[in-house]
Each structure stands twice: as C-alpha cells, then as structure tokens.
Amino acid sequence: IVPWHIISETFGLSIILVPVLEDGSINLEVLEKTLRKAKGRSIISISHVSNTIGFANNLQIISSLIRREDTFLIIDAAQSVGKIELDLDFENSFLVFSGHKVYGPTGTGCIIGSMKNLSRLCPVFGGGDMIESVKWENIEWAKVPYKLEPGTPNIAGIIGMGEALKWIQKIGIETIDSHLDSLTKYTLKKLEEIDEIEIFKPGKKHGLVSFFMKKKNSLDIATLLGSLNIAVRSGYLCAQPIVEK
C-alpha cells in the first residue's frame, strides 16, 4: 500500500480499501460494488498470494469484474511466480514480481503487460537509450521496453534473474509446488504439537506459514530459531495492517 500512498499524496488521487473475508480473500461483492460506483480511470491493486497468510486470490474472477476500458488490474505476484501456474489475459492487466522471490539477485524485478498498455506508461526516471530524439522543445520517447529502461541497466542482476527463471523452468512449477506443499504440511503438523503456538489461517498456504507464540516476543523466537539454522521472519512482514488485525 506504500506506493499507492505516495502516488495519492503526489497526484491527489483517492484510495479505496476493499475488505477481505475471514479466509483472507478479497470481498468480491464489495469490490464489484466499488467498481460500479467508481468514476473515471480506476486501478485495482491486489496480491495474488498474500505474503502473510498464503491465501491465493482468484485472478480470473477478479479480472472478469473489469468491464470498462479505463479500469486496470495490477497484480503483485511476488509470492506466486515460480510456484503457481499463471494464465492471464493482459488486455487490462499488469503483473509485477521481484527477482529475489524467484531465487534471483536483489534489486531486480519485472513488469508484464500488453505492448499497448506498457506504451501508455510514463517513464519514472530519465537517462540514455530511452529516447528516440531530443530537441529543445520536446522529447520523443523510444518504443517499449526502451523508454522504461533509462541509463545503464543492472546488467549482472538481470542476467542472474534470467538464469533463476530458467532454473525454475527446468525443475518445473508442479515439482516446486508439490515440494512446498509437503514441507508446509510437515511444518504445520509439528507446530500444531506445541500448545503455546497459534497458527494463522489454516488451509492451502503455498509454502507460507504464519504463527505466534503466546506470551513470547516474536523477535526473540526468530533469533533463537536462527541460531539453530532455521530461517524465519518476524515482525509486520511488510503488511502491518493485516498482521495487527
């Protein structure tokens, strides 16, 4: 939600929060009513898979609610790319994900959309190789993707991210999903044996388990597990409103 707050403060746009249900899914009824009431260009921003509770939203159903040409869906797929097969129509959608979540280098990422929609985006930064011509009066941008990639790119990072995606393709998403499911079930089974632990949201978690220990500090627990070579993350998980709820 942070980027949307920045954009809202910069351009004076309105942010409307659509509530989620108990299982973590978007309230589709409220979303549909909100879209019907919206005037002018609208953007729906969702996470495909929640990075706090692991629930996956149904992208096909949400996409079907878009009935106007000036409404776009932006999908944060950082938690699902490389783990879940994706089949999307990008007529009114963009999909974004980060490189480090697909086992690639940090500082890399990707945006996927139709050439038509990507061409409508304005450059965020200025630099070389993004322009067709420069004059005193104006600038003519180069075609996509060049107009969105100014200056010297993170060449090593991009190559590393590409190799990471090839590695995922070689192993196969079905194999990865099956392995994650097995690890998740084992983790849940062991955690459920400890009375002091409360687990958030049972069900299909796509390799993600959130829990807390009653009367224990989460950072202390994470530090202890880290000393035992068990890597976990503590705190708000970049989703403070959901964790607090």
Protein language model features and the residues they cover:
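Pyridoxal 5′-phosphate
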Residues: 1-245
